[in-house]
């Protein structure tokens, strides 16, 4: 059984800049993919899969927008997976789920790091790709392997890390 632990983190100024870039890049990729899905369905009545969009993002989108290479690519891929899940949930014929919407800067900002994450209780730090040790308040210890870490920012400017074990 998977369990999540949410910790308050205190990133440095460099890490805050990296997080802001990652939030923006994930939002950009999500909105780009949603636009591609809507356009493909309206023009050709076809649906674009997650694998196709991931390959297109790696080849074409990163060539057009070089700033996408500054952030963790797995976080961008997880944004595409989130969109694919939202699309699948919409077409399941339940009335509880609406059509996926474009992401706004005003929405909750978060990104997922699915691999290469580490929590060090002796140093009170969390490590994710492209960001070295992030100071954190690790108030609760856990046992197990870290599956993923989700970094989020609240509207008041506080940062949190949700560790999935």
Where in this protein do the model-derived segments appear?
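Nucleic-acid substrate recognition interfaces
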Residues: 1-165
């Amino acid at each position: 059984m998977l369990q999540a632990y949410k910790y308050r983190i205190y990133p440095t100024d460099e890490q805050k800049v990296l997080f802001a870039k990652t939030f923006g890049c994930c939002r950009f990729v999500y909105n780009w993919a949603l636009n591609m899905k809507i356009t493909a369905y309206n023009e050709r009545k076809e649906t674009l899969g997650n694998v196709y969009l991931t390959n297109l993002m790696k080849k074409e989108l990163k060539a057009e927008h070089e700033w996408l290479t500054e952030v963790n690519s797995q976080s961008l891929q997880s944004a595409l997976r989130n969109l694919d899940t939202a699309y699948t949930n919409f077409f399941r014929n339940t009335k509880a789920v609406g059509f996926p919407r474009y992401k706004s800067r005003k929405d909750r900002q978060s990104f997922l790091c699915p691999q290469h994450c580490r929590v060090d209780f002796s140093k009170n730090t969390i490590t994710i790709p492209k960001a070295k040790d992030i100071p954190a308040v690790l108030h609760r210890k856990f046992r197990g392997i870290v599956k993923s870490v989700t970094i989020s920012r609240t509207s008041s400017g506080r940062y949190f890390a949700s560790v999935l074990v």
